[in-house]
Structure formats: structure tokens, C-alpha cells
């Protein structure tokens, strides 16, 4: 599986997992109109920049401010698929401006506009935030609670009955507890080991055609804090990358 690092902030300069020779780096640091909200010009620039790279790959896409890139990657899939999202936030807000895709609303964009998506499953979202999603949208998405995550039969008995097509997985590390990921957004309470266990269950039951991982921590004025954050996230990224590659080659 190809590994593609999409760099908006330079954060991967502090993470050694990204230094492997087999990893392709895409420098997006000079793009405008892409931070958290992506306007039409930013969207066009991103599409042009990312066009040479495959959607069926493992993508690292910087901080959660750029999670909307998942919408772009899955728009490139020309076959029926199910989308599985690990995120402490449902990312189903309505856009504030017409024609703008956002880090907080991209799931709704996929749900309403992608002709190939058959199911959307969100794992680890806050119950409070789930209930804030408009009912007509919430009813079209399957949510997995923390209790269900801990029960290994939950996937085949619930989601497994729905899915009859390949899956694309999107992981925002803010679904993890603070000890396992330092992000720009509020964290959930899933451990890295729990996340890996659920991913293995998915790989055992489904055909995974692409993955992206977001949730890096943006730069601050505190250099030591940046280094500490990068160290925690580097460990998570390294472990997830190695696990995904091992599942892909098995």
C-alpha cells in the first residue's frame, strides 16, 4: 500500500515515522483558503496538487483542521464503498457558507453528495455531539459507542450485516485519550490498543481499500511542548502505520 504524507503545517518534520524512504511527501504549506474551511479556490488547488496520488492508499493528512480531505479522497473512488470514521466528533455540522467544505461538516458532504457511499459508520463520537446532529442526518449514519467498541462481537453482529462492499477508513486521533494522542480538539477516551483491536476486527471481516489518519497538533510558540506532542503522535502514527501495513500484506 502506498503511503502519502500531506503536509500543511510542517508538523511531520518533528515525527520520525514520516522519514521512511518509501513514504511520499506532498507539500501543501503554500496553499491558501484550506485551513479548517476549504473554499472553491482552495479546493481546486488541492485537487490539482493531489491529483497524481492514489485514493487507495494510506494517507496522513496533518491536523484535524484538514479532515475534510477525506471527502476528496473518497470522491475519487469510482465504486460502491462504505466509510468508517473514527472520530470524537461526528463532523456533521451544516456549512456556514455555500460551496465551502469544512473539517466539522465533511461527513455530511459525503452523505449527501457522494453517489457511491452505501454506509457511513462513526466510531467513538461523543454522545452529546451525536445528539446535536440533526435527526434526519443522524438516522442515516450508524454510530458505535465506547461500550460496543469493547465488545469484539459488536462489529460482525451490527456493522458487518450492513456492509457488502469495500471500506475506506478515516481515523482522527482525537478519538484517542490524551495519553495516546495530542490534538487540536477535545479527546475521546479510546486507548491506542483499543483502536488497533477494532481495526484488526475490521480487517478480518472487510476489504479495506484506503485509509487516512489525521489529528496532528498544530504549531505553538512553545517549542518544548511541540516536541512532546510530536513524540506522542509519532508513536501513535508509527504503530498504526505498521499495523495497517501488516494487515495489508497478510
Each model region followed by its residue ranges:
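Catalytic cores of soluble, metal-dependent hydrolases
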Residues: 2-61, 65-82, 121-129, 135-250
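Hydrophobic alpha-helical segments and helix pairs
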Residues: 64-119
Amino acid at each position: 500500500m502506498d503511503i502519502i504524507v500531506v503536509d500543511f503545517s510542517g508538523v511531520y518534520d518533528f515525527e520520525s515515522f514520516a522519514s521512511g524512504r518509501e513514504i511520499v511527501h506532498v507539500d501543501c504549506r503554500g496553499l491558501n483558503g484550506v485551513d479548517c474551511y476549504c473554499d472553491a479556490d482552495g479546493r481546486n488547488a488541492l485537487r490539482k496538487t493531489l491529483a497524481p496520488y492514489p485514493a487507495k492508499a494510506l494517507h496522513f493528512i496533518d491536523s484535524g483542521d484538514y479532515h475534510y480531505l477525506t471527502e476528496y479522497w473518497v470522491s475519487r473512488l469510482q465504486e460502491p464503498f462504505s466509510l468508517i470514521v473514527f472520530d470524537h466528533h461526528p463532523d456533521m455540522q451544516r456549512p456556514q457558507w455555500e460551496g465551502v467544505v469544512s473539517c466539522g461538516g465533511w461527513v455530511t458532504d459525503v452523505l449527501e453528495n457522494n453517489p457511491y457511499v452505501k454506509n457511513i459508520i462513526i466510531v467513538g463520537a461523543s454522545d452529546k455531539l451525536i445528539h446535536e446532529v440533526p435527526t434526519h442526518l443522524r438516522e442515516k449514519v450508524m454510530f458505535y459507542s465506547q461500550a460496543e467498541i469493547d465488545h469484539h462481537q459488536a462489529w460482525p453482529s451490527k456493522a458487518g450485516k450492513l456492509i457488502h462492499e469495500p471500506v475506506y477508513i478515516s481515523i482522527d486521533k482525537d478519538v484517542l485519550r490524551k495519553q495516546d494522542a495530542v490534538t487540536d480538539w477535545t479527546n475521546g477516551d479510546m486507548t491506542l490498543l483499543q483502536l488497533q483491536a477494532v481495526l484488526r476486527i475490521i480487517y478480518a471481516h472487510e476489504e479495506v481499500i484506503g485509509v487516512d489518519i489525521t489529528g496532528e497538533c498544530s504549531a505553538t510558540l512553545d517549542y518544548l511542548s511541540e516536541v512532546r506532542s510530536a513524540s506522542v503522535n509519532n508513536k501513535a502514527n508509527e504503530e498504526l502505520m505498521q499495523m495497517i501495513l501488516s494487515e495489508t500484506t497478510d
